[in-house]
């Protein structure tokens, strides 16, 4: 499994719902962009995907 961000849809730091809601703190803001900073800590719970208002964050098979 992998967490991916579609940057054409992601609103980055102005939204940051994934950053603020991830129970494992997998995401970080770098500049105005959200990045998957700690992918090995991800438990693939899907919270990030559920809270993303634009559908930019996906939890998918690799």
Curated annotation (Swiss-Prot):
Signal sequence residues: none
Chain positions recorded as [4Fe-4S] cluster 1 binding sites: 10, 15, 18, 22
Keyword line: 4Fe-4S, Electron transport, Iron, Iron-sulfur, Metal-binding, Repeat, Transport
MF annotations from Gene Ontology: 4 iron, 4 sulfur cluster binding; metal ion binding; oxidoreductase activity
SUPFAM superfamilies referenced in this protein's UniProt entry, alphabetically: 4Fe-4S ferredoxins (SSF54862)
Superkingdom to which the source organism belongs: Archaea
Domain 4Fe-4S ferredoxin-type: 2-31, 32-62
One Pfam family matching this protein: Fer4_7
UniProt-listed Gene3D superfamilies: 3.30.70.20
Binding site for [4Fe-4S] cluster 2: 42, 45, 48, 52
Cofactor binding mode and count: Binds 2 [4Fe-4S] clusters.
Keyword ATP-binding listed: no
Cofactor: [4Fe-4S] cluster
Full protein name: Uncharacterized ferredoxin MJ0199
Species for this entry: Methanocaldococcus jannaschii (strain ATCC 43067 / DSM 2661 / JAL-1 / JCM 10045 / NBRC 100440) (Methanococcus jannaschii)
């Amino acid at each position: 499994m992998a967490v991916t961000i579609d940057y054409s849809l992601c609103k980055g730091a102005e939204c940051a719902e994934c950053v603020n809601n991830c129970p494992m703190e997998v995401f970080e803001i770098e500049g105005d962009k959200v990045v998957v900073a700690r992918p090995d800590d991800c438990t693939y719970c899907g919270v990030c995907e559920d809270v993303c208002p634009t559908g930019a964050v996906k939890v998918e098979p690799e």
